[in-house]
Amino acid sequence: FQAEDGIRDRSPSRGLGDVYKRQSMPAKFAETGKAEGFHALCDDMLYQMKRYFDTSITQPIIGMIRHPLEKFMDSNASLFSKRIRKGRVVQGHGALDPEHIHVQGETVLLSSPQEVYKKYSVLDAANDVATLMLQLMVNGREELSEHFHMKYLEVSRDRELDAILPAYLTYSALMHGVRTCEEKVASSNESLGTVALEFFNLAARYSRELH
């Protein structure tokens, strides 16, 4: 994604499906799409989470997240590899929050995220889908989140998306929790600590959906 990438369609789900077809990554550049690459990203988020809260708070949450994630990745390594072969690991957006989506007439514009988040952009397409779904849900737009999910499935014809989506919802919730902690420190806004914990608890909830 480049700054102000335009999608000539009022539906982000349809536009994303088209963009991802053009931006799938060759296997040699798709290491982060492998189970072990994704595992490392999740471990990094869990480690960063421990930096911001007392162990008595984080340890139970980390346990609820880490064990289901590890079991899922051990059992589904072939699913991650299959998605690389099928071109589902893409040069995505990396931070597909509603604030980066702008509708102008018949065009949906996706503005690029901050440079720091671009290192998270080469991932399974499920990452961007999960990010937008999560943000819509936490902002009270559950129906719109599910509508986007169903439309993306229809357009992308991604039969394995729902098998891997809970893992990326877990990861997205972790990342948003860490980002909120960073904002809390930068702004000295203690109330953001509560918001961050809500994201971490969401990550624990999504991890229970892993099979």
Give the ranges of each region predicted by the language model:
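Single conserved hydrophobic/aromatic residue that forms the stacking wall/gate
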Residues: 1-23
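Short, polar/flexible loop-turn hinges at active-site or ligand-entry regions and domain interfaces
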Residues: 8, 14, 28-35, 139
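A cross-family kinase active-site recognition segment
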Residues: 21-64, 84, 88-89, 163-170
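Alpha-helix capping and helix-loop boundary segments enriched in small/acidic/polar residues
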Residues: 36, 60, 117-123, 136-139, ...
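An alpha-helical support segment within catalytic cores of ATP-dependent transferases
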Residues: 51-91, 198-210
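Active-site acidic catalytic loop and adjacent metal/ATP-binding pocket
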Residues: 77-125, 211
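Active-site activation/catalytic loop segments of kinase-like enzymes and analogous catalytic loops
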Residues: 122-156, 171-188
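ATP/Mg2+ or Mg2+-diphosphate-binding catalytic cores
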Residues: 178-211
